[in-house]
Every structure is written in C-alpha cells, then in structure tokens.
C-alpha cells in the first residue's frame, strides 16, 4: 500500500462551514499511531488523512438523519407525447392520449420450459420412450451374451458364398415372337347436327298463360250463341290487349318497377339490419337499476328530398299494416303557405316513401279508413277535403270537395272516418276554423257534405237551457276526437280557439252535451283515453305550455302538467292506458305514467336538435312512437321497459277493468289533494 501524505495541521480551521457532530465524533475516536523508531521508517504504520474538497457541503445532524422519499413511476421519460393520428370518422387529426410506456432493456429467448406445460410433457414423454428403448436394447444384448456363454463357442456362418433368391431370379432367358401391330379403321358419314337453345323466364311463362286463357275464351265464345261473331270480338280484344302491352317501354313496365322496389327493400333491410334487431329485441338493461325512470331509443329517421323544409302536420298509422304510416306536410304559418305533400312510409324501407301524393294546398290532417285500409282522407289548409286510393298509385284523388259541393273556406284541422250503420256508405267527419263540423258521404261521383254542428261561443255562467244559437257568436274549431268505448262511438270532443272543449253527439246537432273551460288560449289537441269513458287529454299547444287531463263529471281539470315550453302534440299510448306523451318546441319528448308518478315524467329526452316537434303518435301494436318536427323529418323511438309496464290481471279479472280502476284511483287522489289545498287556502 502506498504511503499516505503526511498530515497537515490546521487543515479544518481555514475551511468555511462547521463540522457536524458525527464528524467530530469520528475525529475524536481516531488515535494516530506512535512515531516509528529510528531505522524502522519502512515498517511504520500509515497515517490516515481525510482529504475533502473545498466546496463540500456541510450538513447538520438533523439534515443527515432526514429521510428522503424516492418515488418510482411507470412512465417512460423517452416516450413521445405528441403523437397524432388521423380519425377516419371525424376526418381530422387527433392527439393520441395513450402512449406505450414499456421500455425493454434486455430481452432474450429462454430455453427453459415449465414442467406442467404441454411442450415439456411431450419432451419428457419422448425422453422416457428413448430411455425405455435403450433399456430394451441393452437387455437384448445382455441376454444374447449370456446365451452365447451358455452354449459355448459356435462357429460363425460362412458368408463368403453368395445366396440367390429362387423366387426373383431366373438363370436362363427365353425370347418369344412378337406379332406386329395392325390398325383397322372404318369411315362413315356423320349424322346431321342442329343447335337448339331456349330460355324459360317468368314473363315467358306469363305470356304463355295469357295465350292459353285467350284460346279458352275464344273456344267458349265459339260454343256460345254468338258463334263466330263473339269469337271474332274476343280475338280482337286479345289482339288489342297484346298491342297495348307491347307499346309499354321496358323501363316503365309495372313488372320491372315491382322488381326494383323489392330489390330496394332488400338492400335497405341489409343496411339497417342492426336497427331492425333493436326494434325487435332491444330492452334497456339499466331500467332494472333505476325504477321510476325510462329512456327512448332512436330507431329510423324518415325524410325525403321533397319533404325537407316542410312542417310535419299529421301522422297516421295504417290499420291493416302495422309497419306502414302516412305523413302529411304543410305549414302552420299563414304567410308561408305552399303546396302540400303526403308520403306513405314503411318501416321496412326508411330511405324512400312507398307512395307520394301532391296537393295544391298544405296538408293539415290525414286519416286511414279503419276497414278499407287503402282509403286515405286528407284535409288541407284551403278548406278542401280529398280522398285518395293508395292502391292506384295516382297523384289525383278519387274524391275532392269543390266549391260547388260545399268546399270549406278555412283550414281543416282534423278528419276522422266514421261508420254509417244505416246506409252502409263511407263517411268521414271534418272540423275547420269556421266552426263547422261536417259529415262527408262518398257517393259514386262526388262528396256530399252534411252539417253536424255549428260551433258557437258559450258565455261564462250560461247554462244549457239558456243557450241561444242565434245570439252567440261562431267559435273556431281546432281539434276533435271520438270516443272509443263500445256504444259511445257517436260521442266526440271538440276543442275551440276560445280555450273551451265541448262534448257533442252526432245525434244532437243543436246543443252541447257539456262544456269544459280549462285553457285560456286555443286548444290544439284533444285525445280520448282508449278504455276509460270519461278521461281525456287536451293541450293548448304552442301557447300556454300545459297538457291537462280531464274527467267530464266535475267539468274541471283533474291534473295539470306544466312542461315549461310550447307543446306540439299530446297523445295516449295505445298499449298502456295510463301512459301518455307530449312533445315540445325544444325537441323533447315527455313520457308520463300516471300509475307510477302522478307529477313528473318518467322520461324527458331530447330527440332532435335545432327543430320543433309538432306531431306525436303511438303504434297500436308495437312499443314505438313516431314524432315529427318542423324540418320535415319523422323519427321513430322505442320505449324502454319502464315506460311500458302493464298490469297483470288475476284469474277471472279483465285487463280493461283493472286499468280503469287504476285511472279512477288516480282521479280520486287528485280530487282529495285539491280538496286539501282548498281547505288550507280557506284557513
């Protein structure tokens, strides 16, 4: 070991700083060795000298004993933090928030295998088989050596002589005579050939059937009394029919259009397969964890190029096909009137309407006939009423009210088909702003109107006996609805511009049965409950923000629901008698269930943006609802399980009686709460 430099005296005195307690303790513990004897310098003990830099930091005892926490993180400091990738959905570059933080310092492929792995088991089995084979081979060698020792010395066989296989070896060769090859040919004339081709298609089969039917018709004409003249007439009619079909262009033939429609529907079904599965099988699983709340699932959106920038004024389901509905387009604004449009859509083809009809004025209401599903009654803004036959696929109506046949002067707001038990003819009822409730009868050539009721203003405090039709002024009609209870089909409700709702009958055209005054402004929607004979909804849409449930016995509102926005429409659910919904101008759909919550909606969901909802209608067989807006779009929504809870009647109990009892209970509770509030106000 090299000798250390000699100690320096006064080294610590000139340095800045202060010695710590530990350093002083070490300095006190150190005892320098004794000086060496003369002549023993080579064997002297080394002297330890503590060499310190001039800029060394002096720390106190507390600083030295302080614990410094070290934190290990899993973040890679070398990982990039500004990676961006192109988002194909939004068509923009977006920052990638998640970056791989793994750092590989060393990696090698190991050769060790776990004993329980499949590959290790296979290797151990192979080694075991090799060991067993080696053991058997060694045992055979040992056994042979023992046998050789037992038998003594045996001379080995002489392998010098070559052995021949007597089965494969022939010592002598023999050659035989090979006969030469001979060819024998014959030449004949080939039989004549002909190319025959043909095609069998549906239209060729159809043409053959038509020809066969024509031959049968000619044969029957020959056998009849007319003889040759009748046969000639039948032959001429068949020739004219063929000539007419031949002049139809191929691209305009009905068969081609039908085939293209089928192909278009198949393509749409493949495109919207997921939506169709949601329509059939979707149920919101979260409803099980949030009782008293529900949701609406958007399904299809129905809009066409011609319906854009038009307001949806009416929606009606077809009574025969539960997947088909008609939509009427018009305008509620007086200064923005234009031509009308009617689109008939199907849930199987949401891309295009099945049928389209145009009207000169805006369409305000549509209604399918409940028995003859091909007849569609239409009311327009200019006061005209039309009847279309959807099967004809023609843009012209089969019936239209003209000025000569009693065309109305004001907009027709509501229209309903009505049965005629006496004459067995087709009839429908309309209501317009001029206060006329007309009954229209379809004859062979025209529409015949009949005035059922002339609405008039009822003064406050006036009784039914004091009513004077000549003294009171005319009231403007806005909406109507017929009672759906058996035996009461002739009773209907009428909403007026004065805020009154009149209960009328087709049998009494001079007086109101009763009058309800629950709104301060015009009533634009009124709907009777499907099973309760005295419960109905009314709404003063777009004006006083209230949807009101009424019971006709006390002639006053039983329950009021303030939705804090202008209401577009209100309607009862077809499958749940205690459920109703309303749409507002802010694009929300409010769904109420009086059996679960009598004050607040179970669902208040925004379904459209930058649009006002104008119409609402429930499907009569499926738990879906259609809502229309002022942009010409119709959206279909599916109700979650909490929004379509129905009562399960016990054995011997009817579903209708149970639901009526529930509604009566709701009315009774509302009456008691009103009575308690009146008592508290009196005190």
Curated annotation (Swiss-Prot):
Region (Disordered): 1-42
Keyword Cytoplasm annotated: yes
Gene Ontology annotations for the cellular component aspect, listed alphabetically: cytoplasm; dynein complex; microtubule; motile cilium
Disulfide bonds: none
Start-end of each WD repeat: 358-398, 407-450, 562-602, 608-647
Pfam families cross-referenced by the UniProt entry: WD40
UniProt cross-references to SUPFAM superfamilies, sorted A to Z: WD40 repeat-like
Entry-linked SMART domains: WD40
Family in the record: Belongs to the dynein intermediate chain family.
Function: Is essential for arm assembly or attachment to the outer doublet microtubule.
Subunit structure: Consists of at least 3 heavy chains (alpha, beta and gamma), 2 intermediate chains and 8 light chains.
Name the record gives this protein: Dynein, 78 kDa intermediate chain, flagellar outer arm
Organism classification: Eukaryota, Viridiplantae, Chlorophyta, core chlorophytes, Chlorophyceae
């Amino acid at each position: 070991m090299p000798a250390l430099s000699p100690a320096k005296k006064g080294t610590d005195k000139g340095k800045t700083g202060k010695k710590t307690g530990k350093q002083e303790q070490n300095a006190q513990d150190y005892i320098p060795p004794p000086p060496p004897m003369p002549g023993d310098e080579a064997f002297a003990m080394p002297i330890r000298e503590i060499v310190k830099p001039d800029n060394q930091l002096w720390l106190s005892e507390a600083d030295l004993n302080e614990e410094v926490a070290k934190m290990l993180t899993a973040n890679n400091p070398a990982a990039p933090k500004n990676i961006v990738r192109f988002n194909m959905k939004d068509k923009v570059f977006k920052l990638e928030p998640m970056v791989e933080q793994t750092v590989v310092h060393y990696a090698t492929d190991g050769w060790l295998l776990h004993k329980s792995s499949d590959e290790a088991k296979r290797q151990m089995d192979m080694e075991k088989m090799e060991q067993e084979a080696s053991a058997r081979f060694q045992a055979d060698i040992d056994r042979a050596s023992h046998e050789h020792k037992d038998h003594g010395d045996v001379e080995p066989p002489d392998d010098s002589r070559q052995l021949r296989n007597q089965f494969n070896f022939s010592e002598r060769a023999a050659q035989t005579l090979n006969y030469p090859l001979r060819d024998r040919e014959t030449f004949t004339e080939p039989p004549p050939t002909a190319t025959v081709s043909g095609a069998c298609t549906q239209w060729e089969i159809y043409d053959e059937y038509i020809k066969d039917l024509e031959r049968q018709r000619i044969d029957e004409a020959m056998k009849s009394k007319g003889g040759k003249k009748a046969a000639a007439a039948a032959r001429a009619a068949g020739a004219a029919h063929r000539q007419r079909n031949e002049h139809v262009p191929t691209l305009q033939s009905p068969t081609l259009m039908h085939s293209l429609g089928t192909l278009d529907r198949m393509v749409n079904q493949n495109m919207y397969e997921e939506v169709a599965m949601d329509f059939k099988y979707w149920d919101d699983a979260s409803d099980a964890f949030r009782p008293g709340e529900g949701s609406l699932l958007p399904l299809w959106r129905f809009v066409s190029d011609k319906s854009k920038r038009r307001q949806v004024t009416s929606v009606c389901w077809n009574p025969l096909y539960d997947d088909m509905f008609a939509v009427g387009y018009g305008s509620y604004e007086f200064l923005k009137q234009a031509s009308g449009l009617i689109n008939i859509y199907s849930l199987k083809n949401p891309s295009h309407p099945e049928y389209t009809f145009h009207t000169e004025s805006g369409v305000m209401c549509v209604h399918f006939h409940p028995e003859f599903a091909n007849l569609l009654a239409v009311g327009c803004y200019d006061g005209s009423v039309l009847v279309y036959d959807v099967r004809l696929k023609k843009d012209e109506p089969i019936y239209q009210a003209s000025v000569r046949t009693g065309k109305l002067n004001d907009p027709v707001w509501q229209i309903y088909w009505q049965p005629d038990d006496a004459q067995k003819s087709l009839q429908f009822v309309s209501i317009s702003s001029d206060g006329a409730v007309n009954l229209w009868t379809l004859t062979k050539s025209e529409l015949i109107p009949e005035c059922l009721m002339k609405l008039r203003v009822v003064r406050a405090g006036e009784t039914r006996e004091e009513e004077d039709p000549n003294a009171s002024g005319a009231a403007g009609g806005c909406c109507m609805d017929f009672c759906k209870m058996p035996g009461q089909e002739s009773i209907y409700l009428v909403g007026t511009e004065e805020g009154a709702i009149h209960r009328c009958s087709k049998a009494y055209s001079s007086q109101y049965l009763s009058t309800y005054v629950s709104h301060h402004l015009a009533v634009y929607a009124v709907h009777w409950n499907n099973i309760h004979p005295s419960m109905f909804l009314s709404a003063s849409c777009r004006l006083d923000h209230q949807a009101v449930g009424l019971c006709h016995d006390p002639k006053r509102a039983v329950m009021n629901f303030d939705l804090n926005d202008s209401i577009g429409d209100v309607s009862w659910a077809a499958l749940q008698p205690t459920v109703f919904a309303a749409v507002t101008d802010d694009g929300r759909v409010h769904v109420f269930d009086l059996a679960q919550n009598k004050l607040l909606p179970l669902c208040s969901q925004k379904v459209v943006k930058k649009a006002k909802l104008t119409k609402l209608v429930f499907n009569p067989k499926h738990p879906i609802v259609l809502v229309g807006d002022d942009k010409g779009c119709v959206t279909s929504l599916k109700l979650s399980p909490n929004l379509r809870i129905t009562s399960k009647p016990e054995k011997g109990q009817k579903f209708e009686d149970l639901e009526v009892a529930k509604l009566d209970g709701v009315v009774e509770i509302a009456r008691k709460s009103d009575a308690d509030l009146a008592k508290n106000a009196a005190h």
